[in-house]
Amino acid sequence: VMHTSLGECIRNNKMLPSFRARFCTRQIKIEPARKRMAALAAQGEVNHYVGLRADEETRLGGIFDDIGIVNRHPFREWGWGVNEVWQCLQRHGLAERIPERTDCDVCYHQQIGEWWRLWTNHLDRWMRGENLEIEVGGTFRTPGRDTWPTSMRELREAFESGRIPKSERQPELFSRGTMTGGACRVCSL
């Protein structure tokens, strides 16, 4: 089953994605990509360029050889790690525009600072996530991951009461100077 939106995917599965149920990645990213690449492969050879770095040896990234797709890993071929990739992005004026991660805006992998920036900069998206939690029953955030509330409603209430994540009060301690510099990853796409 392929879906066009996270909300549709969640409603169809009648549950929120979590580290134990990563159906969203498969149904929103992998299956549509496989379908498109299979159609391309039917027309001839397809090279699939994957942005995994040389310092990410254990990650495979998109294995499509069963449908005739050739995976290419240029960063690995060049021996580039995270520093070389960011240096290249800086040389081309792109470093400030690239988010640290490109997951969904209500992904269970988010860190508390990312939740804060979503609430601060994109309240409409926040509320869409909060409503999905209520509709399906459950939370996007993993219980016990940190000392913050788990549900988006309770987390919003904590933010509204003035509680601010340490990463947002002292960004110089938590950002990679070369990354998004504390900018909202949704805004920087």
PLM regions with names:
Residues 1-189:
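Nucleotide-activated chemistry modules centered on ATP-dependent adenylation/adenylyltransferase
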